[in-house]
Amino acid sequence: MAKKVIKEVKLQIPAGKANPAPPVGPALGQAGVNIMGFCKEFNARTADQAGLIIPVVITVFEDRSFTFITKTPPAAVLLKKAAKVEKGSGEPNKTKVASVTRAQVQEIAETKMPDLNAANVESAMLMVEGTARSMGITIQD
């Protein structure tokens, strides 16, 4: 019979940098998970994506074992990396902080496709463009 799920924990952790300190430790400690076991496994799985923030969904079972699924980095993180900026605009409708090309938007949309609720790359691009607009990043043709 399948194991009974007791908790599902969602976190956003920098790739390859999971450690038992907050936010990872307290979130997993409450569920009774082996924190170091998770940290080692997560860091090994995300070592090639250094510098990005990786969303992860950790499923904890009744016997305190766990599985986890890593998602693609948030569109905002990918846009900031493509535009080479530290953070988005505080006033996106007034102050534009950077610009990205349509090709960069398409590349980000293709990266995000597995996690987006989009039927094709064009609709995924529209979602990424909306995120860019809300961050004060303009899109160049």
From Swiss-Prot:
Organism: Listeria monocytogenes serovar 1/2a (strain ATCC BAA-679 / EGD-e)
Name of this chain's protein: Large ribosomal subunit protein uL11
Modification after translation: One or more lysine residues are methylated.
The keyword Ribonucleoprotein appears for this protein: yes
Keyword field: Methylation, Ribonucleoprotein, Ribosomal protein, RNA-binding, rRNA-binding
GO molecular function: large ribosomal subunit rRNA binding; structural constituent of ribosome
Role, per record: Forms part of the ribosomal stalk which helps the ribosome interact with GTP-bound translation factors.
Assembly and binders: Part of the ribosomal stalk of the 50S ribosomal subunit. Interacts with L10 and the large rRNA to form the base of the stalk. L10 forms an elongated spine to which L12 dimers bind in a sequential fashion forming a multimeric L10(L12)X complex.
